[in-house]
Design a protein with these regions (language model features):
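Mature extracytoplasmic domains of secretory-pathway proteins
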Residues: 52-89, 95-101
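Terminal, regulation- and interaction-focused segments at domain boundaries
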Residues: 31-50, 93
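C-terminal motif of bacterial Sec signal peptides marking the signal peptidase cleavage site
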Residues: 11-14
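Helix-rich interaction surfaces within compact, conserved domain-sized segments
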Residues: 84-133
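Positively charged n-region of N-terminal signal peptides that target proteins for export
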Residues: 1-4
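Short beta-strand/turn micro-motifs at beta-sheet edges
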Residues: 21-26, 78-82
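Bacterial signal peptide processing site
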Residues: 16-18
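Structural recognition of the beta-strand scaffold that forms the well-ordered cores
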Residues: 35, 70-71, 123
């Protein structure tokens, strides 16, 4: 059930566009922070292992975002018909300066994870930020 809830949230998120770019002070520039939440529970039982995740990151994610990304270990939870369920999750954070140009790459990563690990959804959020180094 939690997968269907996340799928619904993903669908809603796909309809929303990030807000207007913030007014940034130099050297920062307007950008978009994209967060993808990859649940690690497999539908038939078990979990996406650290080795499986590392392979996915290396062969699917990194080639699409070679300029950099961050991965955090988080504990996700959702409420379904049977109550609250908890799941270990990988949070992928990517900051991009041209969000429309990266939408296909994001979609490819999400589709690859869903296919490779039998997931129903990957939750996604986006927000305008100021970024730079």
């Amino acid at each position: 059930m939690k997968k269907f809830i996340l799928l619904g949230l993903l669908a809603l998120g796909a309809c929303a566009q990030p807000g207007a770019p913030p007014a940034c002070t130099a050297p920062l520039k307007p950008a978009v922070e994209i967060n993808l939440y990859f649940g690690r529970d497999k539908p038939g039982g078990g979990e996406v292992s650290d080795t499986e995740w590392a392979a996915f990151l290396n062969d699917t994610v990194t080639p699409r975002f070679p300029d950099g990304l961050s991965v955090l270990n988080v504990e996700g939870q959702s409420r379904g018909a049977s109550g609250v369920s908890r799941e270990r999750t990988k949070l992928l954070v990517v900051v991009v300066f041209d969000a429309p140009a990266h939408q296909a790459r994001i979609a490819e990563v999400v589709a690859a994870y869903r296919s490779r690990f039998g997931q129903h959804s990957v939750f996604r959020s986006e927000q305008p930020v100021c970024a730079g180094s």
